[in-house]
């Protein structure tokens, strides 16, 4: 889940928790120059974009394999049951990716973005 809160600057407290979007294992997040929230999802091996007004989720980079899809479904079930899923994070999950997808680096709307992983590789992706 990606949660949204109201921030009270004077006190530093949070209130009015709401769910912006539901997705497997949200990790690193970054606001795009267009105002959408981009989120890396290691378990699904995807980069997702969330419209912050509507909560609509769009896949912007997909490196999910068939085995990875099955692992993601199993991982979601385990998370819902309070169980671990680290044993699902195998090379079969990542396919041709040089490691588990964990983040992204964004430029402006005309620039490519980069996909980061647990290793040292960066993958350059042209925006459509």
What is the meaning of each model-derived region?
Residues 48-76:
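Structured C-terminal portions of repeat-based eukaryotic scaffold domains
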Residues 2-7, 49-50, 125-127:
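Hydrophobic/aromatic beta-strand positions that recur at structurally equivalent sites within the blades
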Residues 1, 44-46, 120-122:
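Short glycine/acidic-enriched loop and turn motifs that connect beta-strands
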Residues 112-128:
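C-terminal/domain-terminus segments
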Residues 3, 38, 46-48, 58, ...:
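General beta-strand recognition
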Residues 19-38, 44, 70-73, 90-111:
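Beta-rich, blade/repeat-based domains predominating
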Residues 7, 42-43, 52, 117-118:
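Short loop/turn segments immediately following the C-termini of beta-strands
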Residues 1-25, 54-62, 80-92:
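Blade-edge beta-strand/turn elements of extracellular beta-propeller
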């Amino acid at each position: 889940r990606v949660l949204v809160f109201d921030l009270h600057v004077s006190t530093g407290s949070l209130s009015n928790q709401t769910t912006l979007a539901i997705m497997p294992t949200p990790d690193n997040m970054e606001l795009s120059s267009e105002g959408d929230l981009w989120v890396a999802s290691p378990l699904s091996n995807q980069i997702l974009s969330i419209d912050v007004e509507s909560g609509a989720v769009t896949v912007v980079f997909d490196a999910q394999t068939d085995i990875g899809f099955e692992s993601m479904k199993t991982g979601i079930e385990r998370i819902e049951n309070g169980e671990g899923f680290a044993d699902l994070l195998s090379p079969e999950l990542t396919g041709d990716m040089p490691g588990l997808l964990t983040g992204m680096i964004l430029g402006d709307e005309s620039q490519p973005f980069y996909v980061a992983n647990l290793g040292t590789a960066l993958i350059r992706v042209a925006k459509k």
